[in-house]
């Protein structure tokens, strides 16, 4: 075989598979369907039948914790521990793993082990956490498949806290590693690290972001955009922590508790620091930020640029942080690295901080601008002073907030694994009552289905209600879904997308069926309204398929229970309200983001693939499930009949589409020959004929020999959504 040389220059070509100008380069606004096909088995080194939960059960949990405790003080020559203790470093590692979570879309957080991959492994705020993970490698190697990286990062943070004197609330395992960066997470649009193009108006942060600058976990420790303004910093802190689902008390507890330990590193100019892991030379083997100042570690370490510890005894749980914060006046200085920070004035000997490497040296305590926000902000200050007066409350509240921080993205407590799962449940976990009764049998299901069929509710009412109940699910943080029946509670029952008046009528009818069944059976057998809502959707689809000439059975698994209002945090659930739902052709208002992009975003949160999303859209349209009974996209003359008409008519070349509005958000389809108006549509409808990938899928379902395939695929995708939150049956 001859080498691939240029016949003119004789030089080798540079092209390799996957290189060259991409479609995204040519068409930057192209619909990104890749986010619907992440984490396939092709990128996963584990076998298809690998079950992490089963492997975790084999873990010697206590032996692992002993090894982690020992690691805390096992200082390594290649990265010496500050004060001889890695605990503070591991707390930061765990915090920064979990702290990327944002409540707006449920993405980020520690449940996937994303800190191992770009961009997080190379964020400026994560400088030197590559060393923390590398210190953990011998333990990960020892326990192997029995503990995921995602679980290990969080558990190590717990052990660090415990080893330094804090009683934690517990630990729940069950975080399953992914094996590639996640493309669905929007980290911002800035092209430079620490860029801040995400705020508008009165420092209103762009949704769903929860950090003020690109590459930060929360806020700039020097102050807003590096301006040492404590009150301005407190504003940023409040905004970012709220977007992580933390209130003011939890925020103060987390900051004060976290800064009880360890120190910041800014020994010299950042110019001594090399590239982050993703850009580091191959010989560095995944480590980054190589420091050429002095020894490159220990007292010569360069990290955030700030330098020093917050209090004396930085490896012990004490009240020293709050005591120091309020005891002293503070002077603004610049660290050796040139970063703004604050040093205590006239420090008593007992509050001086021993050097991290040389015990003969002492330093004044330091505070960041964000720390001083806790002292001077009118809301944070009394909370912090109250904690100073009540050490037990402070320890309890920090432990509670830490547990929430590290478990917020794991979903219901039923997913937690291990011997340290707290018995107590918390409202932020969206608790659902346990099943304490016999479940309905196949015979009962047949009986209830007949009652639903005879109730007078339409096919579209039944299907739309089931969809409204189940489609709140988010695969990101495992929240939402049909279990709990919260569609009948605040705030969901009054969401605009759910058409409250119509919803109330449907729920009242289904509730009566539930009550009649339960009252006519023994107390140990019951059916929940949550189950009946989903069963109603099954009935609707079966009837629609029957009208199309197919007798099919939609799978149904009972076992859902009904939560009560007291178990439902209205403010917390408000973030689940759909601002758009392309499956119901709903858009609350006009947005900068195109409706078709919002559809892809929602489909990804629902864990749908592109074919599943496509078949669901086609089915929901012909089932007449649009918001407010809109006719947009209902490309059929036989609504509530489960046919492939949506695809057949969308791809019909006898239809000419024209924008109905200047902004091209609605369209009209005219007969090419007669000019007669045939259909109306939204961008969400027409994207399935416009986008080349989606059109290819739509063509499959429009084929004459795929009518039954369409029905079967629709039922499969439908069932996936109806059971998305049924972790106990997976």
Curated annotation (Swiss-Prot):
The record marks 92 as: Transition state stabilizer. GO terms for molecular function: catalase activity; heme binding; metal ion binding. PROSITE patterns: PEROXIDASE_1 (PS00435), PEROXIDASE_2 (PS00436), PEROXIDASE_4 (PS50873). Binds 1 heme b (iron(II)-protoporphyrin IX) group per dimer. Formation of the three residue Trp-Tyr-Met cross-link is important for the catalase, but not the peroxidase activity of the enzyme. Its cofactor is heme b. It catalyses: H2O2 + AH2 = A + 2 H2O; 2 H2O2 = O2 + 2 H2O. Keywords: Heme, Hydrogen peroxide, Iron, Metal-binding, Oxidoreductase, Peroxidase. One of its GO terms (biological process) is cellular response to hydrogen peroxide. The active site is at residue 96. CDD domains: catalase_peroxidase_1, catalase_peroxidase_2. Its EC number is 1.11.1.21. There is a cross-link at residues 218-244 (Tryptophyl-tyrosyl-methioninium (Tyr-Met) (with W-95)). It is an enzyme of class 1 (oxidoreductase). There is a cross-link at residues 95-218 (Tryptophyl-tyrosyl-methioninium (Trp-Tyr) (with M-244)). InterPro entries: Catalase_peroxidase, Haem_peroxidase, Haem_peroxidase_sf, Peroxidases_AS, Peroxidases_heam-ligand_BS. One of its GO terms (cellular component) is cytosol. PANTHER family: CATALASE-PEROXIDASE (PTHR30555:SF0), HYDROPEROXIDASE I, BIFUNCTIONAL CATALASE-PEROXIDASE (PTHR30555). Bifunctional enzyme with both catalase and broad-spectrum peroxidase activity. Homodimer or homotetramer. This is Catalase-peroxidase. It comes from Clostridium botulinum (strain Eklund 17B / Type B). The lineage of its organism: Bacteria, Bacillati, Bacillota, Clostridia, Eubacteriales.
